[in-house]
Amino acid sequence: MKSIFKSMSCLVLGAMIVTPMFAQQKKLYPELEGPGPVVIISKDKNGKEELINVFEETQRPHFHDPRAPRFLLTDQQGKFALGIGGYLKTTMEYDFNGIVDDVDFIPALIPQPGSTSVRNQFQMDASTSTIFLKLVGRTKHLGNFIVYTAGNFRGSGKTFELQNAYLSFLGFTMGYDTGLFMDLAAAPPTIDFQGPDGMTFYRATQLRYEANVMKGLKVGVGVEMPSVDGTPAQDVRIGKQRMPDIPAYVQYSWAKASHIRVGGILRSMTYEDQVNNKAKSLTGWGIQASGTARLGGFQLYGQYTYGRGIAQYLNDISNLNVDIVPLADESGRMQVLPMKGWYAGLQYNFSKRVFASATYSQSRLFTEDCYAHFNETQYKKGQYLVANVFWNVSHNLQVGAEYLHGWRENFNDVNREANRINLSAQSVSYTHLRAHETCADLV
């Protein structure tokens, strides 16, 4: 515990040191005042401001998503523009008094007792660096027309991996994107790419529809490509799925950067019972409440999720392959387990360029039908604590420091812990959030 308090004290002290430095910085770097430049390449500049507005209006709200691009290519009529952008991010990580077996801080991946004697670990990562192309336009019949593709280098061997590829118009979105059973604008800022262990986060090929039905009220519904991650079992095969996943939500916003959201998801998970040579299905479902609110210089974040058979949507539990699990003593049969995840966070803005946040999160897998008895070393509960400070040095550079502490508890009540310090430097486009803004401002 002493090491935790020392690390937290260092972060607070760092924030106190950085804050007064900003006043000096504005004198040294006057370019920080006012917006940065956008380079527009076009024979005709008519409509350029309108196109820039489309980019800003359709900005993705997640903290790790790139902001509006610096370079725009427009057509001669000024009706369409192609944006090219992204960022380069490098992170240094040091684990102590326990390690996590991944570049992301995932409590579920804290090694089992006796599996390693290593208690400290140093890593560096640049694989979350992102590039994107975004085509936007205002059309007479289709409204704002958006084509967006983005990717980073999280593929096998740090190869390029697609993160988004979708088309959007008139409220419809089709393609590959983050799922609808999540609230990107309510996610807290972290250097850690995965984020809180109890947060919902996933990507899927989908067709969705979202609409503002009245002032402050927004609804959405979709169909998503199913993917079932189950625990291997004798005489059971998990493969082809017969039904899409169906998510939906209702969201109410009462002010800029302040909203509450209630969502749900329904899924049918098919597996083959090879004992009886029969295809069977289990029903999974989840409910979620989330929100964010601004109170003076503070921004609050929170989310609570509960359901059955929704493991792949929860950050920590998605690593366990427990969407469906074997039913004890019954060959060829599977079951769905209850599970939950939640987090609560707070961000404070010291100045227009410096902000800090802290978040606590928890995820829990429950047992039924003697599952825990036959899986004593299986994950039961994970906890995740993060505190960080960010400094937007200029329009093109953001640096950050972060402390993380994680706990993993098994069904046999064996506990393990890990600690990590993250330091990051990230190049950013000119419209990257200032400290007094949050991702919630973008919805």
Residue ranges of predicted features:
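Bacterial Sec-dependent N-terminal signal peptides
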Residues: 1-26
